[in-house]
């Protein structure tokens, strides 16, 4: 793991790959190995009590990464690499693309005399502006702005693990007076097992069908981006969408103190927290295909099972201060076609009051966030019936949370 991280850092920095030199010590019946890694001209020695050669190389790479991370931001090799290669701008662009937002917009202002200009740049992402340090060139000023934006966003990063899924990134985003919980996670547990079984089934036709479906999805996303959100302005569409969840998440509870810390506010423990059912509104994305009801039913059962297991691990106690209620995947696993009568019965989903569908997401129509906010008191099981469900949680105990 550490060797891979060190190698990735070398590739991003356009340096030569790390080289390892190992020595063997001790008697033949109990050998000990020690490794030395050379990275960008610097040598780092690992411990000498490793029992295998592989363990010694990983230990040396771990020592190198630890020493590089302890250096100051101005002299850190990692910071220099990220700054010089423009990785911060790439990270912001990838974040906006994965979240379904508009790409970051950079605004640069030139000041000072002509022979010694000074450039100051600001970047706008998801309705929030971040200003970077002044620089002598426009390119460097934009890098500074991207670095400031990424550092500010990383301060709200909360990493947690909830079986059967591993949450790669959990953000508390304050936007428009509301608090949105955004979860990016890698598929695991039941969802990952089903996907692995589909990959290893040996059915060539099924894999080809999956490729065609993926290509069609990319085409729909391009068409949707060209149309500017399907009939509304691009600015309004990006403001409504905030951040979009691509992968799978389970029902989980998040303390108000954690959300308040992410929002930059202190939490008053004396004030009672509102109930999760009264503070949650849903955005329902119905599918156009007739099989969506059957698929979503399977996803609902899997999510409910994961939620019960998570509640059992917490001793049956539910924290209603801030509740991120069941974010579903873009497309649930495929199942056989059910009879039309069963499909019609499963497609009877209560619609949020005043829920228009002004624009479409990739292949799916999406209700607006404002209309879904009117559906107070609805259970998540009533909203999760078909397609994609994104649930917004408003934390009333945090008065006017400031953007992060």
UniProtKB/Swiss-Prot annotation:
Q: What does this protein do?
A: Binds double-stranded RNA.
Q: Where is the DRBM domain?
A: 1-70, 87-155
Task: Give the Basic residues compositional bias ranges.
Answer: 302-316
The species is: Oryza sativa subsp. japonica (Rice)
List GO molecular-function terms, semicolon-separated. double-stranded RNA binding
Signal peptide residues are none
The record's section on SUPFAM superfamilies has:
dsRNA-binding domain-like
Biased composition, Low complexity: where in the chain? 263-280
Q: Which UniProt keywords apply?
A: Repeat, RNA-binding
Q: Which CDD domains match?
A: DSRM_AtDRB-like_rpt1, DSRM_AtDRB-like_rpt2
Per its UniProt record, what SMART domains does this chain match?
Answer: DSRM
Q: Which InterPro entries match?
A: AtDRB-like_DSRM_1 (IPR044450), AtDRB-like_DSRM_2 (IPR044451), dsRBD_dom (IPR014720)
Name this protein carries in UniProt: Double-stranded RNA-binding protein 5
Please state the gene responsible for encoding this protein: DRB5
Region entry Disordered: which residue ranges? 195-236, 263-320, 336-362
Highest rank taxon of the organism: Eukaryota
